[in-house]
Amino acid sequence: MNKTAIALLALLASSASLAATPWQKITQPVPGSAQSIGSFSNGCIVGADTLPIQSEHYQVMRTDQRRYFGHPDLVMFIQRLSSQVSNLGMGTVLIGDMGMPAGGRFNGGHASHQTGLDVDIFLQLPKKRWTSAQLLRPQALDLVSRDGKHVVPTLWKPEIFSLIKLAAQDKDVTRIFVNPAIKQQLCLDAGTDRDWLRKVRPWFQHRAHMHVRLRCPADSLECEDQPLPPPGDGCGAELQSWFEPPKPGTTKPEKKTPPPLPPSCQALLDEHVI
């Protein structure tokens, strides 16, 4: 499938969630042992943790949206990564969307983030902590040139390279989505230590943040993992294909309704949403 078709499918998957979803009516995590259920783009979570809003190592953006819930493994990853970044004197980690209290489909902006295993992290590390006003209305820093072919040299910093690398080297991380131009710059900067690049995947948009995805927890028996990324650093022909013009004759795919929920997620909705 060419990149234009993939982009249209991704847009449809995201826009399908623009209507209000019943998951928004669940305002607190569902009690129980932590269980991620279903797939990243069609699932839910029982026993989600709340990411502590106050931390010396990170700051949480858009708290009014209440998207700071996730599997305990995700909360621990954020705390682990931000502590590493702080210990290296790199700055404060800016945390974007995680998931809703019970996971599930958003009403816009994300097709995934449904099982408590995804988090968006800004690709900037301020030395001075942001104010409450800045956190509620964050200003993203677009690192990619207008033509989409490379990063903006004056904005690309070694600390951002290190942030992505630290995240990719974490044992629980299975994928990190960034803009193709950012992946390209990582390939140029990586040197001989390249194993971690396999986890960094080019994807549409993602010009100012990275989308980190964790593997399914071993005890979440109904969680559906993705296949591992292809072998290698992903810096060759696959990456270059993202910079090629779309093939002529690409047709817009038909709009699809969301797939049925996993039975456990449907049962959760039936019990907790009137």
Swiss-Prot record:
Its main location: periplasm. Zn(2+) 1 binds at H110, H113, D120, H211. Zn(2+) 2 binds at D147, H150. Disulfide bonds join C44-C265, C187-C235, C216-C223. Pfam families: Peptidase_M74. Residues 1-19 form the signal peptide. Its EC number is 3.4.24.-. GO terms for cellular component: outer membrane-bounded periplasmic space. This is Penicillin-insensitive murein endopeptidase.
